[in-house]
Amino acid sequence: FLPLEDVEAIELRPDVPRLAIEHLGLDDDPRLYIRIGDAVELLPSAEPADLIFVDLYNDLGPAPGHLAWTFLESCQKKLQPNGWLVINQWATDDGKPLGAALLRGLFHRHYWELPVKEGNVILLVPGDLDQALDIDALTARAQALAPRLGYSLEALIKAIRPAT
């Protein structure tokens, strides 16, 4: 659904790529390069990116190193101009992301949150403070994709909120 030239993935758990290939239809695509290891250690050698997804969990729950100021700041600095950092984060009982105070301080409340049913909050962090989230363009793109996806993303887009 995206015109990708190459994708570099850093996965902590070696079984995840194997399971994705065996059960989720992940193809052996020459554009995909998977590195196994801790992103805290491997991020410095990663290429700059237009889009970085961070899943802040290990087998026991939130990974402390991945919810650290220096790591998240390094992720944001790896972004190309107009890039986006997307963080899958646990939600607390009040619906805010775990580490909300750290996130507000680091990103100056310049990010958006998308609460999801599973109890997580997806954070959409722009590469710099001049970037804005264009909801109209996002909605138009989602509407164009809906027939290919077989479902609508409209409810998710409507749930996007400013940083709490």
Model regions: which residues?
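Generic structural marker for isolated residues within well-ordered, non-membrane alpha-helices
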Residues: 17, 100, 142
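The AdoMet/dcAdoMet-binding core of the Class I SAM-like
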Residues: 1-77
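A generic structural signal for alpha->beta connector loops
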Residues: 4-6, 29-31, 82, 108-110, ...
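SAM/dcSAM-binding transferase cores
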Residues: 112, 117-164
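Generic structural "secondary-structure junction" signal
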Residues: 26-28, 92, 151, 162
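C-terminal substrate-binding/active-site "lid" region of AdoMet-derived donor-dependent transferases
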Residues: 63, 69-132
